[in-house]
Amino acid sequence: MRDYEFKEIEKKWQERWSKDNIFKTENQVEGKENYYVLSMLPYPSGKLHVGHARNYTIGDVISRYKRMKGYNVLQPMGWDSFGLPAENAAIQNGTHPAIWTKSNIENMRRQLKLMGFSYDWEREIASYTPEYYKWNQWLFKRMYEKGLIYKKKSLVNWCPDCQTVLANEQVEDGMCWRHSKTHVIQKELEQWFFKITDYADELLEGHEEIKDGWPEKVLTMQKNWIGKSFGTELKLKVVETGEDLPIFTTRIDTIYGVSYAVVAPEHPIVEKILKDNPSIKDKVTEMKNTDIIERGAEGREKNGIDSGWHIENPVNKEIVPLWIADYVLMNYGTGAVMGVPAHDERDFVFAGKYNLPVKQVITSKKSDEKVQLPYIEEGVMINSGEFNGLSSKDALVKIAEYVEEKGYGKRTYKYRLKDWGISRQRYWGTPIPALYCEKCGEVLEKDENLPVLLPDDIEFSGNGNPLETSNKFKEATCPCCGGKARRDTDTMDTFVDSSWYFLRYCDPKNLNLPFSKEIVDKWTPVDQYIGGVEHAVMHLLYARFFHKVLRDLGLLSSNEPFKRLLTQGMVLGPSYYSEKENKYLLQKAAIIKGDKAYSQSGEELQVKVEKMSKSKNNGVDPEEMLDKYGADTTRLFIMFAAPPEKELEWNENGLAGAYRFLTRVWRLVFENSELVKNANDEIDYNKLSKEDKTLLIKLNQTIKKVTDAIENNYHFNTAIAANMELINEVQTYVSSSMNSEQAAKILGYTLKKIIIMLSPFVPHFCDEIWEELGEKGYLFNEKWPEYDEKMLSSDETTIAVQVNGKVRGSFEIAKDSEQALVEKTALKLPNVAKHLEGMNVVKIIVIPNKIVNIVVKPQ
């Protein structure tokens, strides 16, 4: 018998698949429905990590399964290949980003092929190529023409390490998302913005269309990020100048409790205040220089400056002080808020710190209940003029109406979502196709001159904007008047690249348009998208925005980009921390003894199971696993260890277990292959033995269980476990029933169905066995098995027989047999009869189709 030589087998089938180009996908196949499976495209860092392997294995299993279910499946792959790491490599190593990126792509493509993924490589894209980023520029122009792009001076998030602007979504706890120890600062720059806020309502309303296919957690994260708040915009009067100071509040019911007002240090009125009160200028400057993310953080102490100015409350005409405070941000609402310390926890703390008045205007509905401030529950209005006695819920409406009637303000809503700033002061991105001409002003490059190419004469020093160092790039000709012009030296945020890439896969060779509407409408929305939940408010929100814009531009028809979204769980691994060395050690440097680990010097290490990361030294190189166990074993372990949406704890013992299972199946097939090959599949169902029936029922139950597990919730681990149980049943059958031509037919029939069901998980292994069993072609093209309803359960049942509650035997009998026959059969069992000797039968209790309990006592 041949050994399971996985390296030889996997190489053989990868070469055959490639030679026959079996994964090539046509845009339409007669009689087949299109199905688009897509995993988020990777950044080409140079090496696959285990997270990649998990994501792409999930996608490949779905893709192969859907093909076998009769769909015309598109599963492409490409590279999100612009971005800072390539530029940083150029700075550190003197390697041009294009060379570094191309080399990394080649290695990662090789690794993906080693995993046996069924990608249509003819559709491969890479966002760093002019063939791709030309269309970023073309789409920029179309959005500009539609009024969805503008440029303005703006306070932006600036990473001192990246030397570039970050979107709000790229700032995490005040730190750069790429440099976790770098504080983001505020800087005022001219920036290009996409008007994503124009689509805020539609982005919220669109959740209704995708709610059945997307995780609720992702929809909630997007809803909170968009942050639509209903309230009232109220015009407070600045006493010193008579001008209006608009504020936005969701709690107009507390307007009578205002004891101060607050503005952000960046608010335009602050400049006027400083002219009148220059003594506070240094404090204001210090406040403005504080990290804006930190300023808005929950739990941080709030700091304020008394401006010396006052405002008049239009509702009760009270004069209250105007303060400047760091917790008020210009990028939300109007940059000014009212202070109601009796009914807001933050305001209460601020008022206490600066000894500001506290005025209660809502009390408990229970008149005898003593209220502790701040009181933030619903209640009854007090100290609120004509609104006294109303419930605070009713007052919210009545006071808003009153404010509108009097002309003091209006009911409106605000968003937390801000327009998407896309300008980046780096080289390795899509050049913005804008120019500045003294005569014509701001103009965009002509379509026929696209793409605006990245220049080669760049100095990668790590300081400032690299494109500013290229005169060849900056000096240009105005496309309108032919005069001298200067190119915009910013590049686009790389999230632009990934906001529409899934559409380019549909029509990747199109030279005239980013894609054909006719072709894209055949494939989109993407049927199944797979990626991490960390992309909820960046990539996934931007892609939804882009899709709606492209629909409105007439470039496609669907409203949403992704019908279903699967967010796979993180991959965890053991980490080993040395307090003595103050660092994480590699697993191979740790000495494992039972559930403890020690360093080479004998120090006991802190062992945790954590998300795999470079900083924790607990990552696993998938290629090492491929070399040791093979792609199929690695794929099987990944899919068996946990449901896809749950965390997966990497465990080499689990890999070894998956390998043992495959070798067991291998032996089972090869030990019986000659028998199976010589038998046809024509089973005589009228001549089935008890063992034949048992196996065929188990087979049909397994087909149903596997199909349901994949179709209903992608619980691939359940599907694999069901096949493992069936293999156990087959081994029992082989050891007891291989004594007829019928048995050989049933064995062959069952093994082939198992191999088909395992093939999405372990494709090389299964194609090899398929060939060994005398079958032609690729399993990729086989039809997924269907179960026979009539063979899901036996027409017989097993009855357990108890004597005084203890099991003494069992027998099989037709279901729903008459009770007299059941009792008679039970009493005849030899071991039961033995335990009835010398006993009187008191009564016999029969639970139909399950148990017979014979109650006895001594004679």
UniProtKB/Swiss-Prot annotation:
Q: Name one GO biological process term.
A: leucyl-tRNA aminoacylation
| Transmembrane segments annotated in the record for this chain | none
* Keyword DNA-binding attached: no
Q: Which SUPFAM superfamilies match?
A: Anticodon-binding domain of a subclass of class I aminoacyl-tRNA synthetases (SSF47323), Nucleotidylyl transferase (SSF52374), ValRS/IleRS/LeuRS editing domain (SSF50677)
Its subcellular locations are: Cytoplasm
What positions carry the motif 'HIGH' region? Answer: 42-52
**Which top EC class is named for this enzyme in its record?**
ligase
Tell me the GO molecular function terms.
Answer: aminoacyl-tRNA deacylase activity; ATP binding; leucine-tRNA ligase activity
Recorded catalytic activity of this chain's protein: tRNA(Leu) + L-leucine + ATP = L-leucyl-tRNA(Leu) + AMP + diphosphate
What's the EC number here? Answer: 6.1.1.4
Q: Which domain of life is it from?
A: Bacteria
Q: Which intervals of this chain are the motif 'KMSKS' region?
A: 611-615
The main location is cytoplasm
InterPro entries per UniProt: aa-tRNA-synth_I_CS, aa-tRNA-synth_Ia, Leu-tRNA-ligase, Leu_tRNA-synth_edit, M/V/L/I-tRNA-synth_anticd-bd, Methionyl/Leucyl_tRNA_Synth, Rossmann-like_a/b/a_fold, tRNAsynth_Ia_anticodon-bd
Gene Ontology cellular component annotations, sorted alphabetically: cytosol
Q: Which UniProt keywords apply?
A: Aminoacyl-tRNA synthetase, ATP-binding, Cytoplasm, Ligase, Nucleotide-binding, Protein biosynthesis
Query: Where does this protein hold ATP?
Result: 614
**Gene3D superfamilies, alphabetized:** HUPs, Isoleucyl-tRNA Synthetase, Domain 1
UniProt record similarity statement: Belongs to the class-I aminoacyl-tRNA synthetase family.
Protein name according to UniProt: Leucine--tRNA ligase
Query: Which gene carries the instructions for this protein?
Result: leuS
